[in-house]
Amino acid sequence: MDRIALVIGNSDYSNVGKLNNPKNDADDIASILNKLNFDVTKIMDANLIDIQKSVNDFLQALDEYAVGVFFYAGHGMQIDGKNFIVPIDLKLSDKSKTMVSCYCLNSLLEGASSYKGKTLICILDACRDNPFAMGRGFLTGFAPFNNPPKGTMIAYSTSADCSAFDGQCSNGLYTQVLKDAMLIPNLKIEEMFKFVRNKVSEISISQYGEEQLSWEYSSLVGDFYFSVTPQPVNEQVTDEKIYEFICARRKSYENASDNIYDIECLPYIDAYNKYHIPIIKILRAY
């Protein structure tokens, strides 16, 4: 297992508006990520200390994994261009006190930036029924993240500076669509989020008469799939370019065992989305 996830769902707020669906969202996304072979930690109705500890643990563990997913559902806001997720026990106060009482998502990205060669996906289904918009300096919705670390994708449930719908069923509208899209096999993450955006837009206009437009910022450098279904392969026949690529490195594999995957060739082969077998078997076929 080379994939790790931290899932947080905050619904039962003490001093700001309670939300119906984030706990359900977190339950469902955590369950799906487990099915997709992620090592999942799920935190429900978290206060600031809970959030800080779980994020710190997640970042420390990320060193041992290739891919990390952070999912948050609950209240969120921006102050002075920075994005914050809201703990369940927050008391509304002035701007400076609120900033130190919430978790700054920019800290998560800064912490992840020290891990080179990792893929980090942040999915933020927040900014619902925002209780902070009336306060001076508190803005509805999240702000754009500037210069995310290389290998990062940040997905918002709605456009910057806008609110998201909490949904008319057991999930927020965004997660309602996302949880099904994540299970579509062999769909690149960029195409998956495009699919989500179109469905969320269509449903929001139909149900609410107003468009919710999800958004992503990406610095990904490779292909990523949540769900991969290996395609049948004739081990005696493979793509000519891949064959030449592997043969040029044949000596590296002369002593390889059946369960060894080459760290250089495998991403190249997986990118074609059809050669999901050990490199050594391809070599033996030739």
What kind of region is each of these model predictions?
Residues 1-286:
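Cysteine endopeptidase catalytic domains of the caspase/legumain-like
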